């Protein structure tokens, strides 16, 4: 009986210790979650102004910002297009044109754009253009990097200006590339090229003039 009484007397202490451990674990978990939240909040991304092209930093989760040079408003909204669209898009967020989506009669201004559907306009990107469909792009095209996938068949009505290009599909158009242009093995490029550096994989084809510019 004495052993039972001693055991019973220790139970409250054991329970208190257990509760304290649980409380510490909960507080530690909350502190970790708060730390992750603030890390996400403090993460920055580079944004190019739509008005003056000045590049500044803004919170990664922000929906808009103001240019630190000219004070202009810069939208950071992302667009996902699933149907026909002909309204203005001016953002430094990202744009995705889905397979059933189509964009016509406008110049899309954004950061990155992924085209899985139809695009018959122009593109002005501060980031990457990725084309994975059949498109005839009638407007001007400028970007940091252009990626044309092997399933794509693209015709550019005007000269394409980019820093880097990776082509693995069928392309018609003229290119001015200030960096490297890479024709992968499935690539077929019909058009003239002005480029600083060029790589042509075995199997790739190019019809046109090449001008190497330092």
What feature does the model see in each segment?
Residues 1-45:
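A broadly conserved sequence feature marking short terminus-proximal activation segments
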Residues 35-38, 53, 105, 157:
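Residues at structural and domain junctions
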Residues 44, 62, 69-214:
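Extended beta-solenoid/beta-helix repeat architectures
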Residues 48-60:
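Short Cys/His-rich zinc-binding micro-motifs
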Residues 49-52, 65-70:
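Short cysteine-rich clusters marking metal-coordination/redox-active sites
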């Amino acid at each position: 009986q004495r052993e039972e009484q001693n055991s019973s007397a220790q139970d409250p202490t054991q329970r208190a210790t257990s509760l304290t451990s649980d409380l510490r674990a909960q507080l530690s978990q909350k502190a970790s979650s708060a730390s992750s939240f603030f890390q996400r909040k403090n993460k920055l991304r580079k944004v190019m102004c739509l008005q003056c092209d000045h590049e500044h930093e803004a919170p990664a989760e922000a929906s808009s910002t103001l240019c630190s040079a000219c004070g202009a408003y810069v939208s950071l909204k992302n667009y996902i297009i699933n149907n026909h669209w002909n309204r203005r898009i001016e953002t430094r967020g990202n744009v995705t044109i889905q397979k059933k989506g189509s964009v016509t009669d406008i110049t899309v201004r954004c950061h990155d754009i992924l085209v899985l559907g139809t695009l018959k306009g122009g593109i002005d990107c501060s980031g990457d253009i990725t084309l994975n469909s059949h498109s005839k792009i009638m407007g001007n095209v400028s970007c940091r990097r252009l990626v044309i996938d092997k399933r794509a068949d693209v015709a550019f009505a005007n000269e394409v200006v980019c820093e880097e290009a990776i082509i693995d599909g069928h392309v018609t158009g003229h290119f001015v590339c200030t960096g490297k242009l890479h024709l992968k093995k499935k690539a077929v490029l019909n058009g003239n090229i002005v480029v600083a550096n060029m790589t042509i994989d075995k199997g790739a084809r190019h019809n046109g003039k090449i001008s190497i510019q330092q």
